[in-house]
């Protein structure tokens, strides 16, 4: 059975992985814009001496970012699997967690309300019980 600290660690690592993925996606989009400014096709771009070198450099950076993004997304899937294990271990306490995860699709909502800081598992479980009674 997972301890409270282990749950906290996994949820924090998911949040960090998500932030990294967003950063990498932003960098990839910036690179795309740098490679091909909007409205201009690459064949229409003026050929300057370093054109091929520049494109090769951008392609290399793009590929590296793509690989980093894949690794981060793999990490997210691993942590989601652990979140599902938590649900199996403590289904009543995890009910709100699961609902928030499905409907908001925001991991921040899970982390802030449930495990990072202030609220204990007991408060969380108590809220779940109250919600089931309604």
Tell where the protein language model's regions lie, with residue ranges.
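Short alpha-helical "recognition helix" segments of helix-turn-helix
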Residues: 109-114
């Amino acid at each position: 059975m997972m301890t409270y600290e282990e749950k906290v660690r996994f949820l924090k690592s998911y949040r960090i992985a998500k932030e990294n993925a967003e950063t990498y996606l932003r960098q990839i989009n910036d690179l795309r814009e740098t490679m091909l400014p909007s409205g201009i096709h690459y064949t229409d771009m003026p050929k300057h001496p370093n054109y091929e070198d520049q494109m090769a450099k951008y392609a290399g950076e793009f590929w590296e970012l793509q690989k980093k993004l894949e690794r981060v997304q793999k990490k997210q899937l691993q942590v989601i699997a652990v979140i599902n294990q938590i649900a199996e271990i403590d289904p009543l306490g995890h009910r709100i967690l699961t609902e928030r995860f499905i409907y908001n699709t925001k991991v921040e909502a899970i982390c802030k309300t449930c495990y990072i800081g202030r609220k204990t598992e007991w408060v969380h479980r108590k809220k779940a019980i109250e919600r089931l009674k309604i």
